[in-house]
């Protein structure tokens, strides 16, 4: 899984950061996590192809997370996108999106499905398991835990050779079948293949203050994407507006033993104070990045 941040600011666009938008590359398809105003314009500076986007996951319905969605859906159609697309989001998304497309006379040349989720829902999309949890914000906001598919184990070539099996197509048969035959005898393939390799886990949180569901989503994740709208000195402001601070994000990363933390949704008040902001994050959780627009990160790097 590879992520590219299309917008890392909060509230409104700035010269330094666009509003929320994140692309998740799953090798042969792409997902968007939120689609704030200008997201499709940001995509012009990347290699992301709208027609390859198969799903959009909306964390909540604040404008800085959804105002770019109708435009993106229309542009995808104009660029000859014909494959079906599913938009997942909280209650109210379907009504708003259908009204916007209807009132603007927007016609989509592909099948659009809008699925409204609730706390605890799970979905299988493009062979990935997505778990949805409700967070704590001034407005209904959610986060996602994305479990990638496990990969087959490695062939134990040493054991296979002990049987006298020559290299060739039978090696693939052993890996992909429950049993295999060699010289008139049948063998259980699992005895000659290592355990399956677990898929990568990515947790992506919408706007939130610290809460138990955030912990459930992040627990043991290879990557946690967490908002950090404010630095710790503005903790009172963070609580007033339903957001998290840098140290609240790092505290969760530490508590959940995540592999990597990337903080995003950064307030424009910190323009010119970027080094100070970064230091506050990495001093508490060294395996951290502060997202900037167009940052790319491959899970496992």
UniProtKB/Swiss-Prot annotation:
Which annotated residues bind Zn(2+) 2? 64-65, 207, 265
Q: What is its EC number?
A: 3.1.26.11
Instruction: Give UniProt keywords alphabetically.
Output: Endonuclease, Hydrolase, Metal-binding, Nuclease, tRNA processing, Zinc
Q: Which InterPro entries match?
A: Metallo-B-lactamas, RibonucZ/Hydroxyglut_hydro, RNase_Z/BN
Active site feature? 64 (proton acceptor)
Q: Which reaction does it catalyse?
A: Endonucleolytic cleavage of RNA, removing extra 3' nucleotides from tRNA precursor, generating 3' termini of tRNAs. A 3'-hydroxy group is left at the tRNA terminus and a 5'-phosphoryl group is left at the trailer molecule
Q: Required cofactors, per record?
A: Zn(2+)
Enumerate the residues binding Zn(2+) 1: 60, 62, 137, 207
What superkingdom does the record give? Answer: Bacteria
Q: What does this protein's record comment on cofactor binding?
A: Binds 2 Zn(2+) ions.
Annotated GO MF terms: 3'-tRNA processing endoribonuclease activity; zinc ion binding
The record ties this protein, via SUPFAM superfamilies, to: Metallo-hydrolase/oxidoreductase
NCBIfam families membership? PRK00055.1-3 (NF000801), RNase_Z (TIGR02651)
- Summarize subunit and interaction data from the UniProt record for this chain: Homodimer.
State the protein's purpose. Answer: Zinc phosphodiesterase, which displays some tRNA 3'-processing endonuclease activity. Probably involved in tRNA maturation, by removing a 3'-trailer from precursor tRNA.
Q: Which family does it belong to?
A: Belongs to the RNase Z family.
Q: What is this protein called?
A: Ribonuclease Z
* Species of provenance: Exiguobacterium sp. (strain ATCC BAA-1283 / AT1b)
């Amino acid at each position: 899984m590879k992520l590219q941040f299309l917008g890392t600011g909060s509230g409104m666009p700035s010269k330094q950061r666009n509003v929320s938008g994140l692309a998740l590359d799953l090798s042969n398809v792409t997902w968007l996590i939120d689609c704030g105003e200008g997201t499709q314009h940001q995509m012009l500076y990347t290699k992301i192809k709208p027609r390859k986007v198969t799903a959009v996951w909306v964390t909540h319905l604040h404008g800085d997370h959804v105002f770019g969605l109708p435009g993106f859906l229309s542009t995808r159609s104009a660029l000859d996108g014909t494959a079906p697309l599913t938009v997942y989001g909280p209650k109210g998304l379907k009504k708003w999106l259908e009204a916007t497309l209807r009132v603007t006379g927007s016609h989509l040349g592909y099948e659009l499905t809008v699925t409204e989720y609730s706390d605890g829902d799970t979905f299988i999309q493009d062979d990935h398991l997505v778990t949805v949890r409700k967070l704590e914000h001034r407005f209904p906001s959610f986060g996602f835990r994305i479990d990638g598919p496990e990969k087959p184990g490695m062939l134990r070539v040493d054991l296979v050779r002990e049987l006298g099996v020559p290299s060739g197509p039978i090696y693939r048969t052993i890996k992909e079948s429950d049993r295999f035959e060699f010289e008139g005898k049948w063998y259980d393939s699992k005895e000659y293949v290592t355990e399956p390799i677990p898929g990568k886990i990515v947790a992506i949180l919408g706007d939130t203050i610290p809460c138990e569901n955030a912990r459930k989503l992040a627990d043991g994740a290879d990557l946690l994407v967490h908002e950090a709208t404010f630095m710790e000195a503005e903790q009172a402001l963070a609580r007033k507006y339903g957001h998290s601070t840098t140290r609240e994000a790092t505290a969760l990363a530490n508590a959940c033993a995540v592999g990597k933390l990337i903080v995003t949704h950064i307030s424009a008040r910190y323009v010119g104070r970027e080094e100070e902001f970064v230091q506050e994050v990495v001093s508490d959780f060294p395996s951290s990045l502060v997202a900037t627009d167009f940052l790319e990160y491959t899970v496992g790097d």
